C-alpha cells in the first residue's frame, strides 16, 4: 500500500505578489537614500492629543473597523488642521482613543467615540501595509 498523500490533497498556499528590489545604489550613497533607510521609529506607537471645540471638525477621516479585520485607519488628514499639526497622517492605524481599544471596534462605534469626545488622546502607529490592504479590499 502506498502511504504517500495524493497530489490533489496537498494544501494550496498563496504567496504575496513579488516586489522588485530597489535599484542598486553604491554603499556610500545608501545612508541618504529612502529605499535603504533603516530608521524604524516612524512605525512605533505614539500618542496624539487633540482638543475639539463644540461643533468643530476633527480634521481627519477614518476607514475600516471590525468588519475589515484590519483595524481603524486614518484615511485623510485635512492640511493645516489641528490633526495635521499634531502629526496624524494617512496610513496611521488608530490603536486606542481615550483608553478605548480600537483594534477590534465597529466603524460606527469608532465614529461615535471620536465625534462625541471634546479632548482626544489617540494611540496610533504608522502602518501603511495594512492600510493599503484595507483600501484594496474596499475598492473591489
Curated annotation (Swiss-Prot):
Keywords: Cell junction, Cell membrane, Cytoplasm, Membrane
Keyword match Repeat: no
Transmembrane parts of this sequence: none
GO terms, biological process: neurotransmitter secretion; pore complex assembly; regulation of synaptic assembly at neuromuscular junction; synaptic vesicle transport
Stretches assigned to the PDZ domain: 47-129
Cellular localisation: Cytoplasm; Cell junction, Adherens junction; Cell membrane
Domain of life according to the entry: Eukaryota
Keyword Membrane: yes
GO molecular function: protein-macromolecule adaptor activity
Chief location of this protein within or outside the cell: cytoplasm
Described function: Mediates docking of ADAM10 to zonula adherens by interacting with PLEKHA7 which is required for PLEKHA7 to interact with the ADAM10-binding protein TSPAN33.
Protein name: PDZ domain-containing protein 11
Gene source species: Bos taurus (Bovine)
Organism placement in taxonomy: Eukaryota, Metazoa, Chordata, Craniata, Vertebrata
Amino acid at each position: 500500500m502506498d502511504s504517500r498523500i495524493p497530489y490533489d490533497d496537498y494544501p494550496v498556499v498563496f504567496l504575496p505578489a513579488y516586489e522588485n528590489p530597489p535599484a542598486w545604489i553604491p554603499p556610500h550613497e545608501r545612508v541618504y537614500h529612502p529605499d535603504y533607510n533603516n530608521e524604524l521609529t516612524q512605525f512605533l506607537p505614539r500618542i496624539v492629543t487633540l482638543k475639539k471645540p463644540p461643533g468643530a471638525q476633527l480634521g481627519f477621516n477614518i476607514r475600516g473597523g471590525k468588519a475589515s479585520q484590519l483595524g481603524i485607519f486614518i484615511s485623510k488628514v485635512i492640511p493645516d488642521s489641528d490633526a495635521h499639526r499634531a502629526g496624524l497622517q494617512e496610513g496611521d492605524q488608530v490603536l486606542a482613543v481615550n483608553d478605548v481599544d480600537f483594534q477590534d471596534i465597529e466603524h460606527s462605534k469608532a465614529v461615535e467615540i471620536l465625534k462625541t469626545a471634546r479632548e482626544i488622546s489617540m494611540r496610533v502607529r504608522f502602518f501603511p501595509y495594512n492600510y493599503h490592504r484595507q483600501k484594496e479590499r474596499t475598492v473591489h
